[in-house]
Amino acid sequence: MKRMSQAFNNCLTHIKKEEELYMYQKKRNSLITMILTLTLVMGCLTGCGGGGSKGDGQSADAGGSDKKPVTLEIIRWGGGLPAQDDDIIKAEILKRLNVNIELVGYDDISDYINTVNTRIATGDYPDMFWVNQELLRNYSKKGLVMDLTDVYQNELSTVKDWLGDSLDMGVVDGKTYGIPVPISFEYCMSFIREDWLNHLGLSIPTNLDELYDVAVAFTNDDPDGNGKNDTFALTGNNGLRAFSAIFGAYGVALPTNSGALPSIYVKDGNLVSTVTDPDIKDAILEAKKFVDAGVIDPELFGNTGSQPVQDKAFQGKVGMTRIEWSLFAKDIHIEQAKAVNPDASWKPMGTIGGGNGKELDGEWQIGTPVHMFAIPATLSQSPEKKEALFKVLNYLSTEEGNRLVAYGPEGTYHQVNADGEVELINNDLWKKSDLQAYLYNYQFTGRGDESKYLIIRNPMSRDVIEFAAAQPRIKCLNGFVDFPEGFVASDAATFAEEELIKFIYGRRPIEEYDEFVKTLKEVYSYQSYLDAAGETLQSMGYIK
């Protein structure tokens, strides 16, 4: 009551000054003065007195508030960010939420990991930072990152609803620590030169025998008609993945990335891994047949990154490749390929049969996010920063907020039509702008419907995107499994990959395969990892 009385007195003083000013400027009739007085009293009591409504949520959160913006420092693995003064997404978030995000990206993942480890070791915590699953496990076990298990039920409930079951990717020892950025389908797929097939009178292969015949013809029968023996059939990035279609014919998953552990998945109701799959030996022998025929790119394991694969494909040196569609068939890649050879026609190639009837197109790690973020436990000591960060994460987990970080500011880069569908306003503006190169850095909670997003951003690639999304995959579960004590994943992964290459290339006889698995399990403690996987995945309901 005392507070209300003081507010009322303040308002009366304000009213008196207003009346004197109006009388000085010009005479007002008593009715106008009365209306003005009543208006001022009501305005002061509701605005100055502090007991009224704040109005709608958007204006309460917007940058138009007199309240000083809260600054958040976020660091991540990622590149392409402009100078902060030129960052229009930063400016939009500041305007909409009154939060100033200072986002720093590191192009090189090794540099990033060294930086974040150093900062955390010295207590110099950012307000949020990028993690992979190994970093998340290490930090969570040391109590360095915030436990979000209960937070997702309360302050971050909007994020929880947005991400759904994907939150399982951020779980360590039964508690949720990560903010995962999920991917709704596997990008890696096979492509083939349709014009080479037409020149040779062949069709896109659908089984192993046809694949072998096409591979031999692409290597030996001058598919480009230049009169030279200068082509190979098959290449890919990340090493062993080039053989994914062959192994997929047996339902065997090969790790998508070089240096990764053998894939973990359920087959015929049983938990298996790449190296323990009962069909692995047959798949190895089939792949060896292609190697022995000389149809594989001899520089296959030197293809670091996507550039060598793009160069060989677009320059007409290979006729089949295994690579992420996003590194090979986006609008920009289609234009690059046509610039080199307007007649070149690359088409998606589906699953290959003829093995054991599985016909699956490689692995899809459903437990592994494409990106993930963690919040330092120390942020709980800064309530204002924590509230601001949660505000940002919740906002980006709404349709409106997600459109901002998916397509740029509405009205300039995209619009929503009468049917509620997003349309890019000016595709030329997209191509000229650096916005498309750095938007993903702000997608802290993903981008909703992945296929829809990708088609809007890459309209020329619609057929490829829909093809990739529809491919049947081997759903792999490595991301859900914590490493047991004493298990050095990198050593086990390196040994397994090196030995598989030896078997495929005939440098080690298949008769020694069981000995290899025994060594992996015992010397490299791989059995402890399989045991941990069985326990975890049974608790999650993937196996009985």
PLM region spans:
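Methionine residue identity
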Residues: M1-M4
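Basic Arg/Gly/Lys-rich low-complexity intrinsically disordered segments
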Residues: A7
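Extracytoplasmic/secretory soluble proteins
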Residues: N10-L12, K16, E20, Y24-Q25, ...
